[in-house]
Amino acid sequence: MGGLCSRSSSVNNAPGGTFAHVNGHHLNNNASDLNSHSGESGLKDDPSPVTENVDDNKHTSESFSFPIVSSGSHPQNIEDGIPRLSRVLSQKSRSTKSRQAAVAKVSEVSSLLGRAGTMGLGKAVDVLDTLGSSMTNLNLSGGFSSATTVKGNKISILSFEVANTIVKGANLMHSLSKDSITHLKEVVLPSEGVQNLISKDMDELLRIAAADKREELRIFSGEVVRFGNRCKDPQYHNLDRFFDRLGSEFTPQKHLKQEAETIMHQMMSFVHFTADLYHELHALDRFEQDYQRKIQEEENPSTAQRGVGDTLAILRTELKSQKKHVRNLKKKSLWSRILEEVMEKLVDVVHFLHLEIHEAFGGADPDKPANDPPINHKKLGSAGLALHYANIITQIDTLVSRSSTMPASTRDALYQGLPPSIKSALRSRIQSFQVKEELTVPQIKAEMEKTLQWLVPVATNTTKAHHGFGWVGEWASSGSEANQRPAGQTILRIDTLHHADKEKTEAYILDLVVWLHHLVTQVRATTGYGLRSPVKSPIRSPNQKTIQLSSGSHNPSMGLPLLTTEDQEMLRDVSKRRKTPGISKSQEFETVAKARLCKHHRLSKSSSHSPMMGEMMKNKKDTFSTRRPSSVPIIDFDIDRMKALDVIDRVDTIRSL
């Protein structure tokens, strides 16, 4: 307190008996008495005069910490009659309160550490975690208050990641609305895809849906925690401990829903401007590159052209206008917002979403796992096969819709992408496949459509879900209308192949592939052309009957297009490269290599010095004709285009089963 009194005496002991200005005048009356009074209070270091004055005026509130002095006491109070603040008592009151709070906090910490020392290492870790999470309460404001004492930084370049997180929260909030929950329970869960691939038990499906929403909330809150750790204000640090305590709080708060909706609407408006800023920054970068390139062209006399100066002036004007537009967008978007202000709103949104999930799926037990651990590995999502199986289903649907004009590359890609379990079971299923009566092509497609009509939408949702939010800024193109989607349009994980049973899905795919093989057989039998069955490879037989394509097999009434010149040349080249049965690959390679190497070739410089090379080149045609008599079939170009393509693809043979 000595220091505080010294500061007070230094103010009161003005040199020459002159006091501070009061209404613009110096007070010099009774200088000797005043100096003696001030010197007494300063030298004795005794606050008793102030204390007596306070005791005489007990009716004055102690919180203001100043005495009311009568008009005749001191001359400095005569002019305006306004009470003056006593610095000694004010600072004494504040220091006393802060010292008491500090003593209480230290005693609490010491008691915690004392208990930790007596309970062992494990308990000490828990106590230290509790202590660390309570350190944010050391500030006087306490809680998540908007009137923060620490001035935070602007979000700036981090605004795109913050916008990405806000869109995730908006999507989750939209999926928890009453309309979306009604759509989930009445449309999604009873659908054929969910019932056939996941489960027919509605309670289990509700538990799965609730677990998905909690997982989305965990991801969203994790990003909020990451942004909170970047704040200057320490009360937003380690928010994960605060969110963990929310797990046991399910008290509904009516006002919180309205506040959360208002907050999200406000933040989504910032997200829209941030999305525009994202695109305009890319445009600004292009303008700057064009401007710099024009400057280089103008400085280089060899590449200088007429009108470059005018073009440069136009680019300079556009660049200046674009920079101004970007500055305006930065002011309207999240770029210029304070991170602490946004964090305060995001914390409220996390709290609201936690309560909404509990209200929407209150009947689903969160502690009971949606799937038993022994069978969890049989789900496509946990096995990482959901997207791959979705692509297979999409390819099958494409082949069925274009069964007569599908290129061979797509057919081969389908077979190569089949899982090993389907490939191993495919041969026996095709051999045992029997139909009671011969079905036409439309009838076969109708049978396949019974499965494809509910399986293809699930595969499509899987592909869309995997392509969402893969990188920062994707929300700028697709996520900005998240709050404008109608109910039921948000893709739910339960409506994809993520939770689909692996064995059930493979059984449906195998059935579709077998029907596809039967469809191809019927198409080829009725039209004489079409798809090569994508399942032909595993049932090849060494006993093959080769049928030469001749002009007699062509049906002129079909009106199919003839071969073009390029197709004829390609067909010749493929026919020349046909392998001869009974000749190994090494022998065939040697024959072709000898036929191609000549003395004019760059890699055969010593050919003119070899006597055997000249003899070989002399008898080249005879060797080719004697060793490969059946390798060049008679090509009849008066055939339809599809049959010629089958010859090119080497599918012009009928292979016995």
From Swiss-Prot:
Signal peptide region: none
Keyword Lipoprotein: yes
Gene null: resulting phenotype: Short roots and hypocotyls due to both a reduced cell number and reduced cell elongation. Plants missing both PSI1 and PSI3 are dwarf and contain reduced starch levels; these phenotypes are partially rescued by sucrose.
Pfam family, one: DUF3475
Stretch list, region Disordered: 1-80, 534-559
Main location: nucleus
InterPro entries: DUF3475, DUF668, PSI1/2/3
GO annotation terms (biological process): positive regulation of growth; regulation of carbohydrate metabolic process; response to peptide hormone
Protein's cellular compartments: Nucleus
Lipid moiety-binding region (N-myristoyl glycine): 2
Job of this protein: Promotes seedling growth probably via the regulation of phytosulfokine (PSK) signaling; PSK are peptide phytohormones acting as growth factors. Together with PSI2 and PSI3, required during vegetative growth and reproduction. May also have a function in carbohydrate metabolism.
Name by which UniProt lists this protein: Protein PSK SIMULATOR 1
Lineage: Eukaryota, Viridiplantae, Streptophyta, Embryophyta, Tracheophyta
Gene designation: PSI1
